[in-house]
Amino acid sequence: MSLPKKQVLYIALELTTDSQNKLKEWFSKQMLNIQATHTNWNEYSTYCHHMTIAFYTEMTQKTYTWCVSHDAEKFKITAKELGISDKAIAVKVDTLCLSENVLKHVTLATNKETKGKPVDSNYITEWQNIEPFELEGVVTFYKKYE
């Protein structure tokens, strides 16, 4: 359910449970190859949860208004590239859903050894094509902690 703008922490295209499970299963298979070629990925946290539409510190009124009018709407997402840095792993996605991120993506994991955070997926520069696959997400509002 949409919230007044001042109460919003972020708005996301939250993956459906089926899509989260599908992405986690796909990622677990990829992780074997990643660990073989990137030796610093031994301890990590898995996410596979959402594509950020906007975080409150950068959210424009236009984006907020769009999200209110599309609240709880489902969107198809196509995963098309895998990105890896020393701090984060993500899939780049195509979707008709709006996002204020330069690159639309879903964070898959962060590296505990390098103190990676989900925001670090915004700074991935190395991407490789993957066999595209479909996911689905729902526009969801997340409230600030008070």
Model-derived regions: residue spans:
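Histidine-dependent nucleotide/RNA phosphoesterase domain, centered on the 2H-phosphoesterase fold
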Residues: 2-146
